[in-house]
A protein has these predicted regions:
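Cationic-aromatic interfacial patches
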Residues: 22-135, 139-140
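Small/flexible residues
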Residues: 5-6, 60, 422
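Bacterial N-terminal signal peptides that target proteins for export
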Residues: 1-11
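Positively charged, low-complexity intrinsically disordered regions
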Residues: 4-5, 28, 363
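Low-complexity, intrinsically disordered short peptide segments enriched in small/polar/basic residues
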Residues: 4-6, 16, 264, 440
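C-terminal motif of bacterial Sec signal peptides marking the signal peptidase cleavage site
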Residues: 18-20
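Residue-level signal for mature regions of secreted extracellular proteins and peptides
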Residues: 14-15, 411
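Well-ordered beta-sheet/strand-loop patches within structured domains
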Residues: 22-25, 38, 111, 131-138, ...
Length: 499
């Protein structure tokens, strides 16, 4: 199965689908350590503190605030969003009335900017974007910074304190420069381009790749598809999540022809999501990048484990959330959500009587006197032999799967909303490190025993389900992924509506 094409259609609205995966109890890729210390807020008033009154700004403080608002566009904000055309004139007006208006406007803009840097522009949150920014009293914080003469330090603390955010900001400047210079050429459609080909399309391919990545050092005067160009195409395919064939097939061509301005908007959307993250991350954590279909484990900020994952389909979207894995279930049965049972399994039984029994399904009683469909644990169970539970309102979790076919594909968004893992027992071994009872051999013995067991973790592991369609690799280069849920488009639309 090849990767589906879902090249960004910016500003469109995505229909949200309910996420349902069920549990047996009935209940950034990231590429390097996140900043888990941050700059801190030593001058921030505690939530219960008395409101700090405003006081006049000194001229040097005014200059710092104006400079910050003027460069807000470098953080992905709209041009002039916090810097209206009359701002500077009113701030420096000789007339006392206009000057007072300018001072009030300046305060309004810097407070609005501070809230925006904390991800608070959006108010109409989709149901399955459960990772939301923390409340933030920007006005009181600003007044305190003025009072303590720490305006510059306060401003420096406003953007997300993560290396990956800073790298996205650098990438934003670079891609904006590409747009300003005219973007990159479009490659005409036609037969698959592969080694040995020649002609105008190959010449356009060379030019296209060099505009985005000058370090490839391609000869843009040549129209030959040689070994050097093959390596460059493979490099592009790795950066964009395609099979590294070195051939320009339909999906690779569609990706190459995405406009540079669309890449700018994609970066802007991902910078916005970083504003929703907790400012201090746990040093040990699991990150799932839904868009890239990858899971990464960090231990003490060091990359410890990574593997492919299979998140929900576009009609069964895996939600954005943060929680903690507190238990692991061995040989888990699957309580099938009623929506999935009615949509998928009851029709199969109607078409092929005996299907449910043949695949290990049965009906069980529920506490409210009803009945629900359950798939027994075992080799055929959709949850495989192990699942990782964490509290959340969507009844989703990480789990094993009896079918590993998807892990060999580029497009792995195939689940009902939960996240399937390529090597779940490797993760279990990591989570039980230091536990003298649940050794790898003990886990395998328990699985072979066939009984369902829930094991509480001595140290719950934070887990972040995130959606990065642009993220830096270990060398700081940008990787792009398809907007499989149209969430970039939806987010950009919500930002535009927040004006």
């Amino acid at each position: 199965m090849t990767r589906r094409s879902n090249i960004a259609v910016w500003m469109s609205a995505a229909a949200l689908a309910a996420v349902a995966c069920g549990t047996s109890a009935g209940q950034p890729n990231s590429t390097g350590p996140a900043n888990t210390t941050g700059p801190g807020y030593p001058y921030t008033a505690p939530p219960q503190a008395q409101a700090v009154p405003s006081q006049p700004l000194r001229r040097d403080q005014v200059s710092v605030v104006l400079a910050t608002l003027k460069e807000a566009e470098t953080h992905g904000f709209r041009a002039g969003e916090f810097y209206p055309a009359n701002l500077e004139a009113e701030v420096y007006a000789a007339d006392p009335t206009f000057h007072a208006q300018g001072d009030a406007l300046l305060r309004t803009m810097i407070i609005r900017y501070a809230r925006a840097q904390h991800g608070l522009r959006i108010t109409n949150w989709p149901k399955n974007w459960a990772m939301k920014p923390a409340p933030y009293d920007a006005e009181n914080d600003f007044n305190l910074a003025v009072q303590q003469d720490r305006v510059a330090q306060w401003i420096d603390s406003l953007p997300p304190p993560f290396d990956r955010y800073r790298l996205l900001r650098t990438a934003l400047a670079r891609y904006k420069a590409i747009v300003a210079a005219g973007g990159w050429p479009t490659i005409d459609g036609g037969p698959e381009l592969k080694p040995g080909a020649a002609g105008p399309r190959v010449a356009a391919l060379r030019q296209r790749l060099m505009v985005e990545e000058p370090t490839l050092n391609l000869d843009t005067t040549s129209d030959q598809f040689d070994d050097t160009l093959t390596d460059a195409v493979k490099y592009y395919q790795r950066r964009n999540g395609f099979d590294t064939t070195g051939k320009v097939d339909t999906l690779t061509l569609e990706s190459l022809n995405v406009a540079a301005q669309s890449r700018v908007l994609q970066i802007v959307a991902n910078m916005e999501r970083w504003r929703w993250e907790p400012r201090l991350w746990p040093a040990s954590r699991i990150e799932v990048n839904i868009a890239a279909a990858e899971m990464t484990l960090f231990e003490e900020n060091a990359l410890s484990l990574e593997m492919r994952a299979a998140p929900g389909r576009p009609d069964d979207q895996t939600p954005l959330l943060t929680s903690q894995i507190d238990s692991i279930v061995l040989n888990p049965p699957w309580n099938v959500p009623s929506t999935i049972a009615e949509k998928e399994y009851y029709p199969k039984e109607a078409a092929h009587p005996g299907y449910l029994a043949a695949h290990g399904f049965r009906f069980i009683d529920t506490p409210d006197g009803g009945r629900r469909l359950q798939q027994k644990s075992g080799a055929k169970s959709a949850l495989g032999q192990i699942k990782f539970d964490f509290p959340n309102p969507f009844a989703v979790y990480l789990h094993d799967t009896p079918s590993h076919k998807a892990f060999g594909q580029d497009a792995r968004d195939v689940s009902h909303g939960c996240v399937r893992l390529e090597r779940p027992f490797d993760l279990a071994d990591k989570l039980f490190t230091g536990d003298e009872t649940w050794t790898p051999d003990r886990i395998q013995d328990a699985v072979q025993d066939g009984k369902t067991q829930r094991v509480q973790l001595e140290r719950p592991m934070p887990v972040f389900l995130m959606y990065w369609t642009v993220y830096p690799d270990v060398k700081g280069r940008m990787d792009f992924r398809n907007d499989i849920y149209d969430w970039d488009s939806q987010l950009l639309g919500l930002i535009a509506a927040s004006r």
